[in-house]
Design a protein with these regions (language model features):
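Sterically constrained small-residue positions within well-ordered secondary structures
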Residues: 34, 60, 114-118
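Oligomerization/assembly interface segments of phage tail-like spikes and tubes
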Residues: 59-76, 121-131
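A generic structural signal for ordered secondary structure
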Residues: 13, 38, 65-67, 118-120
Length: 131
């Protein structure tokens, strides 16, 4: 059976929790106050249109999407801490790792820095998945 987007999101969030990286996590839809100092994470699952695996209405659809984890820090400490934390997140989602059922990490995770805001430095980790 093809996992639902909710099942995939649950598995991704569980895997991030199980990695026990030591950073506070702002889960989607929950109240969260970012720390005054130090790194924190903000995960978001973005399902994409599935790949139809045939022409019949009963054929399966292959799920795909991206899991992004925003890695944030307060300015003043430089970019090394936030990039180290991004590397920790990437190391927790290796290429071909099982997410749930047949859903796997599709490619090596990658990250990029976003223009800093007045109150935060940002690195976004992208983890593509397909199943």
């Amino acid at each position: 059976m093809t996992p639902t987007n909710t099942a995939i999101a649950t598995a991704l969030f569980s895997q991030l929790t199980a990695a026990a990286l030591g950073y506070p996590i702002a889960w989607p839809g929950t109240d969260f106050m970012p720390p005054a100092t130090g790194v924190w994470l903000e995960p978001m699952v973005m399902p994409n249109t599935g790949i139809d695996n045939g022409l019949a209405a009963t054929d399966t659809t292959i799920p795909q999407g991206i899991f992004q984890v925003g890695v944030f820090d307060r300015p003043g400490r430089g970019v090394l801490a936030v990039n180290r934390a991004a590397d920790d997140v990437k190391a927790s989602f290796l290429k071909n790792a099982t997410i749930t059922g047949l859903v796997r990490v599709q490619r090596n995770p990658y990250s990029f820095e976003i223009q800093p805001d007045a109150d935060r430095l940002s690195v976004i980790v992208t983890i593509p998945y397909t199943g």
